[in-house]
UniProtKB/Swiss-Prot annotation:
Pfam annotation, one family: ATP-synt_C
Main location: membrane
Record site: Reversibly protonated during proton transport: E55
PROSITE patterns recorded: ATPASE_C
UniProt protein name: ATP synthase subunit c
Amino acid sequence: MDMKLLAAGIAVLAGIGAGIGIGIATAGALEATARQPEASDKIQSLFIMGAGLSEATAIYGLVVSIILLFVA
């Protein structure tokens, strides 16, 4: 097996962490909205910002894996 493929596969694992993180954050946001519906606007904006930051790690992993496959 080529080491580039192994390294790219390991870099893609960042997507798993991002998926788990966004899932946990979504569950927390839904629970918080259910407890305090009047604060749903603030909860939603904070959730979207946090989900974007969490998704950035998955995008970085994808970029690294593409670089490893095609450049390295």
